[in-house]
Structure formats: C-alpha cells, structure tokens
C-alpha cells in the first residue's frame, strides 16, 4: 500500500555508525559552527567519514520532473510528488536537523590512475535515509547542486542544468534496462541561479537515491591516511548495513576477505550488463565505483552507437583508459585498490579481532609482508571469479538479445555478429532492435541481410564497398542464425527478444537536443525523452511515428560517437 512522505521511516545509519569530522562531531556542534567550517573547502583529518551540514544554496525552485519508478521504490503515492513537502525535500530546503541532520561524505580516489587525495561530496548533501515500509528497503536521499561543502575543493558547489538533465535521464535509462544504478527521484530548476563553466549556464538540483553512496574511494582515503580503526568501522558498517542483502562473500577467509569478494561479485554483475548494452561510464575512477556495484555519478557517459570497442565518450580520456573495451579491466584495477586498503584487515586472517596482534601487524615489516602476500593470493582468485562472472553474464544476456538458447556452441554467432558491426562501423542499438522486430524466416537471407545493413549503416552510408561487403557478411551470418533459431516459434522468440532489446537508446545526440531546447526554456522534448528512457522497450510512446523513429533510429555520422567533457 502506497504511503505519504510523512509515513516513511526516517533514519541515518551512516552517521550513527561512522566517525564524524572531528571539527563537527555532533549536530549541536554543527549548529554552532562557523560557515568556514561547514561550507569552505578544507582537509578533514582524524579518520572522519562525513561532515554534518545543511545545503547552503537557497533559491526558488521549479519541479521539472519526478521518476515514477523511484517514487514506487520508496513506496510513495504518486500524488505526493505534487505536495509542498515533496518539492521541498527534492531540493533540500526546509530541513529539520533535529529529526535527521544532513551530511556530506568524505572520500578520496584514484583519478585516471593517479592518487587525487581527498575528494568527497563537493556539491552533494545527503538529507536522510527513507525506508519503504512495505519492502523494508532503505534509501539514502541526496541533493546534488546544493552548494559548497568542506569537500568542494576549487568548485562552486553548483550543478548546471545540462549535467543535471544528463544524470537524471541516465538514471532512468539504466534502471529501465535492468542495469544496477543509483536512482534519480526528481530534477528541479533553480530560478535565477547560474554558474560559470565554458559559458554562463543555468543551474538545477537532482535529488537522487541509493541504498548506499559508499565508494571504493571511501576506503581508499582511510587506507592511504593509515586510519585503520576508521577503516575497520567503515568495513563493519558495510557488512552490517549495506551488503547484507544478496551477500556473496563465499565461505573462505575472514569477514573482510568476504567483503572484498562480495564487492567484486556485485561489480562483475554490473560490468557484464554495461558491456552487453554498450554503456560506458566515461570516468571510472575509484571514487566512481560503488561498493554495491551500482552505476554511479554520471558525467561524460555514453552508449555505443557505432560498435567501436575503443570508443570512449570522455573527450579528456586521450589514452582510452575508460573506453568500452577497457571497462572490465579498469574495475579490476579499482578493486585492487580496495584490496590494498584492506590488506591489514584481510591479511590478519582469523586474528583480525585480536587488537594486540593487529598492533603488532601494523608495526612489523615481516607480518605486513605476509599480510600482503596472503591478500595478493586472495585477490588473484577473486579476479578469476570476477572474469568468469563477467563473461558468463555477458553471454547469457547476449543470448537473450539475439534469441538463442544459452549454449556455448552459439557463442560464435554473437562474436561474429559483433565483429561484423565493428568491421563495417555499424550501429549496435539499431542492429539489435532490428533483430527483435524482424524474423529471418520472413524473407530470403540476402534480403534480410540487406535490410539489416540498411538499419544499422552509420559512418559510411554512401560507401558502396562497405554496403556490399557488409551485406555479404550479414548474409553468411543470417544463414547460420536462421539455422540456430529454426526450432523456435517466431512470435514467442521475438516477443522475448523485445523485452531485452530497447527500441529507444539514450544517445548523446538526443541528450544534446534535449539540453539545447531546455536552455531556451522549452521542456517538451525533455518530457518525451523522460517517458522513452523510462520505458525503452515499448513499440510506441504515443508520439508521432516520424518523431519516434527519429529519436530511436537516427544514426548519421554527425550524430555518432559524440564525446563529452567532465564539465558539470
């Protein structure tokens, strides 16, 4: 039964169980603190994992959109979105610190492979945790673009409308595809608030939610700073409050070894789905890697249009570190940093709760070497498990996308199809959309191949050699594909394929057009794309066929392989 906002239990397990910023140790201290402590960038020392504060950016706001799926996840009545209480919540205004005091998380991170030091929530404030009374699921509610915090570094604490629209829509798109993700609850315009980026841009606030916002970077900072007790409290909090549901820590090792194995498992499951749907985060630093395996912090993200495994949507990623091809290995690299942070806790094995031994370990070169050796051995095994999960889950989903039984003999059909797409620079989303809406049994192989080519020709629409050779390659593939699917009934196979092959993909050119319209005060296209991103498998969304086909299938050279900056 759906509830009103006031009926949802409010909590803050994060601040109740973890060490605070030493300069703001309590809510009472926050009430008395100078603005320079709360909203001016500084280093937080002493193992503090958060700072109590309230959003500093105050402005009149306008609700642009809310997410029906997120409202449902919270167990709210949809009518609640029209109330003043909801619209104040999603911009972080009218906060009751005595009921639950907001906070900003402290974390660090490796960015493009280099240690970046303290990062943290530089423009994000966590307001509280809300629990769905029916499901018992707890969500930490954040507002992004809420003003400066101690973690803002050189930034202004604002989020521009452009990046806010991108994050909101990406959350909706990935959630609808079944890819583990943080969720957007709402997006609101801020009246009269602007920020200087490449140009002066209007600002917005995205209200977002997740069971936890802890990242590998949260562990990195405590490990680098040698804050072992803070690290232990963080790990125990994750084990007791964050990772309990669906825990896959295995049967070997102490609880911290199991934590590492579980985080690797969750991220492997997510990476497999990224690869199957061609999603790229664009900036997979350790501070953008969730311990829950959630896709998180959407900046220069993108979906593959042309199937180019070397593509990165981040134009600052000149060495292709975060390209589509490299994502599985980059997550392994990030997991290795989590293992490094936990090395003493994992390497202590069954003596991890013997505080006298832990003191000896911390100060003994020989014991530390043994701890490193053991942790390295554990990590090697976890990496093998991770790789197997990524590969198996990737093929399981790809089998569904092409409508084939999960049989190892069919893998060659998938690899050959992807190779054709790569060789002739063809469009991946359009290819799978065509396959799920057209049966090869309905026409001759060559005719089917020609129509498939026409659906996904992209960078070389007028190149006769590419057209002819790709049709020839497709004709050969379609013959084998027809043979593999001939025992299945067409209508049921296509119906199943349509459930996993989106009709609409959130391409970067679509986002550019949405943002261009929004920046002149027109939000009609934004609202249409909201609907399409949230329900990508539909045959129609009630708009004109011409407009829907344009948004779903347009794949001209100028609209393909668009890169973005990290500016937000």
Swiss-Prot record:
InterPro entries documented for this protein: SelO
Biological process according to GO: cellular oxidant detoxification
Protein origin, superkingdom: Eukaryota
Cofactor requirements of the protein: Mg(2+)
Pfam families named among the record's database cross-references: SelO
Entry GO CC: mitochondrion
Family, as annotated: Belongs to the SELO family.
Protein's name according to its UniProt entry: Protein adenylyltransferase SelO, mitochondrial
Taxonomic source organism: Schizosaccharomyces pombe (strain 972 / ATCC 24843) (Fission yeast)
